[in-house]
Every structure is written in structure tokens, then in C-alpha cells.
A protein has these predicted regions:
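Class I S-adenosyl-L-methionine-dependent methyltransferase catalytic core
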Residues: 1-185
Length: 185
């Protein structure tokens, strides 16, 4: 496993590589990146890098909501609300993106908000809704990071399962440029 950072963060932003039962479908995450079981995700030492008063922003698809809330708790946080709701738009044509979904056609994804201790919100004007085009598989809109900083302030922050360097953010993950060790298969 990739070595975890040794410092404390007041903001933790994560887009876990969830495993799904429907691995055989064309949209399966396993076609794009290595996924992790709930047990492996829950075993990550996230609580060790969380400051006494900190906030967790955790992406989850709707079939994963119960597991996502359980993961928030496993990492030492308390679920509070949906922090952000991403309404996916098409890149090449007007209108909304429609995925396959599980019961109904999927269009949106949520980023849950959990707290540890008593973190302070800096700006109460931050909107939950994000209307942005869907890009490559699982890539989230950059606007989310901006809204997190506006909401909470310029605090020590890390993105878990990061794929790119972003100014002001530390990163950790199998695809993060500074990580020289890949996750165990």
C-alpha cells in the first residue's frame, strides 16, 4: 500500500475506487482503474490524518450510499449532509448526460459531508448544486475543490485517490504523480 502522509488535515476530499457487483458491464470501474473492497477502504488510516476539527467530503454513487455512510463512520467522522450534488451535462450536445443507472437512468452524483469535532464553516453562501460536463470516467469537476475551499477556508487539505496535482492541495493515491508505490493487487 502507498504510504499515508504523516500530517493532520482539516479538509479531506475523497473519491474512493468503489467495487461494484456489476463488474461485467461496459461502465465498470475495473475497466478504468483498480478498485478496492469496502473492508480495504475502511482499513485506510484516514482517522490518523484527520485533525481534531475536520471535515470529510466523500463521493458516492447512489447504490453505494449505505457503504459510503459506513465508510464515513469507519474513518472517524459523523455524516452530516450531502455537501455537493453534481448534475452531469453532456460535453458535445446540449442537455444532461444520462448514464445506465441501476433502476433509473443515472444523471447525478453526490459528495457526502462528514465532520469530526467542530469544524467551522467560513462561507454560508456556497451552493450544493454543481452543473458541469462529464469528462473522463470518474473525473470530478474542478469546481468542487474551489467550493470546498470557499466553504471551509484555506486550511490544510488533502485529496485521497487523487490523479493530479492541484495547487494548495496535498494528494495521495495510486495514480497521484508523487506516489512511487502502487496499491497491492
Amino acid at each position: 500500500m502507498i504510504k499515508f502522509p504523516q500530517k493532520k488535515y482539516e479538509i479531506i476530499y475523497a473519491d474512493p475506487p468503489w467495487q461494484y457487483r456489476d463488474r461485467g458491464t461496459n461502465g465498470a470501474a475495473e475497466h478504468y482503474y483498480q478498485t478496492m473492497s469496502f473492508a480495504d477502504l475502511a482499513a485506510l488510516p484516514v482517522r490518523n490524518i484527520a485533525a481534531k476539527d475536520s471535515v470529510l467530503f466523500l463521493w458516492a454513487t447512489y447504490p453505494q450510499l449505505p457503504a459510503a455512510i459506513a465508510l464515513i463512520e469507519a474513518w472517524g467522522f459523523q455524516y452530516k449532509t450531502i455537501g455537493f450534488q453534481w448534475i452531469k451535462q453532456n460535453r458535445k450536445s446540449p442537455g444532461y448526460f444520462l448514464g445506465c443507472g441501476h433502476w433509473t437512468r443515472g444523471n447525478s452524483e453526490c459528495c457526502l459531508l462528514g465532520v469530526r469535532g467542530k469544524p467551522k464553516r467560513k462561507d454560508a453562501s456556497v451552493s450544493q448544486l454543481i452543473f458541469a460536463c462529464r469528462e473522463e470516467h470518474s473525473k470530478k469537476p474542478a469546481e468542487v475543490r474551489e467550493k470546498i475551499v470557499k466553504l471551509m477556508g484555506d486550511l490544510p487539505r488533502i485529496e485521497l485517490f487523487a490523479r493530479q496535482k492541484v495547487a494548495g492541495w496535498d494528494g495521495w493515491g495510486n495514480e497521484y504523480p508523487d506516489c512511487d508505490t502502487k496499491m497491492d493487487k
